Regions:
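Core catalytic lobe of class I
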Residues: 2-303
Length: 303
């Protein structure tokens, strides 16, 4: 088996992206600085623009370069959290500590009211869609251990978004690699009861399934179910010099879905595509190098 390698590029996002060849990246998992939350003390940084519109425009510019380096059948997983409009002071990050002496402030952006939720993730998602990206999914990252908030007039924020974006309508996505455990006992008892009295739910379910072999023909109970769009993943502490680290358990399913565990073909660059048996619709573990949806990129060790 070929040894996995990786390369770390440090610097301005656009400048570093420009060093990569066209259509050379298989999958992108990214979480850019959120709008109006923190000053990292870097000139020209993303996140401290005067208005949400300027912030969105900056990200659209970055993602145009992402689109250039992404393979035509590649995927992007974009994590973004929201912000609230307020007169505030930003904390300036200084390695592991926050230098509160260098704080500076910002006012409520034009067009918004104090305490408005700004809807930044969706502003970015729609702008990228308008710029030519396919917006395929809005994954909810549910945090069972969210940061405490002192508010008493709204619920505590306990989720962020992970948008799945693509360059085309067809792309590489390994659904088998990220299947989740199926809980089907309730469905089985409700729709496949052996008792004499069949409920209306039984009949409706059978009618809905039609010629697809009933609900059993639509579901693969033995091998799990297609991953849902709400991912419950706890935040994790990090001792390094960073204040907003994505949990590895959030990154892992993105990489597994967007890349092939067997790598890619050395001749054509296509990934090894998983082949499913038609009889059971279950993955066999076999792979095909001539996949119509193919991607290439760097494999992260341990994922």
């Amino acid at each position: 088996m070929r040894k996995s390698t990786y390369r770390i590029l440090t610097g301005d996002a656009i400048e570093q992206l420009k060093t990569l060849p066209d259509r050379s990246v298989q999958c992108v998992v990214t979480s850019p600085p959120y709008y109006a939350l923190r000053d990292y003390g870097v000139p020209g940084q993303i996140g401290l623009e005067d208005t949400p519109q300027e912030y969105v425009a900056r990200l659209v510019e970055v993602f145009r370069e992402v689109r250039r380096v992404l393979r035509d059948d590649g995927t992007v997983f974009l994590n973004l959290g929201d912000s609230y409009a307020a007169n505030r002071s930003y904390q300036v990050c200084d390695n592991k500590h926050v230098d509160v002496g260098n704080n500076h402030g910002s006012s409520v952006p034009p067009g918004l009211k104090p305490k408005d939720m700004m809807g930044i993730p969706w502003r970015v998602a729609f702008a990228l869609q308008d710029d030519g990206w396919w917006l395929r999914s809005d994954i909810i990252w549910h945090k069972p251990n969210p940061m405490p908030e002192s508010v008493t007039d709204r619920p505590t924020k306990a989720h962020e978004y992970v948008f799945l974006l693509t360059k085309a309508s067809r792309y590489y996505y390994d659904a088998e690699a990220v299947k989740e455990e199926a809980i089907y006992a309730e469905h089985h008892n409700r729709y496949h009861s052996k008792s004499a009295g069949r409920t209306e739910n039984n009949k409706n379910a059978d009618n809905l399934a039609g010629n697809n072999g009933g609900l059993r023909g639509l579901m693969n109970y033995s091998d799990g179910r297609n991953r849902r769009s709400v991912w419950t993943i706890a935040t994790q502490p990090y001792s390094g010099a960073h204040f907003a680290v994505m949990p590895p358990t959030l990154v892992e399913p993105c990489i597994k879905a967007g890349t092939s565990e067997r790598g890619c073909c050395l001749r054509c660059g296509a990934p090894w595509r998983r082949v499913a048996e038609k009889e059971t619709r279950a993955g066999t573990g076999a792979y095909d190098a001539v996949a119509e949806a193919a991607v290439i990129g760097t494999k992260i060790p341990g994922t």
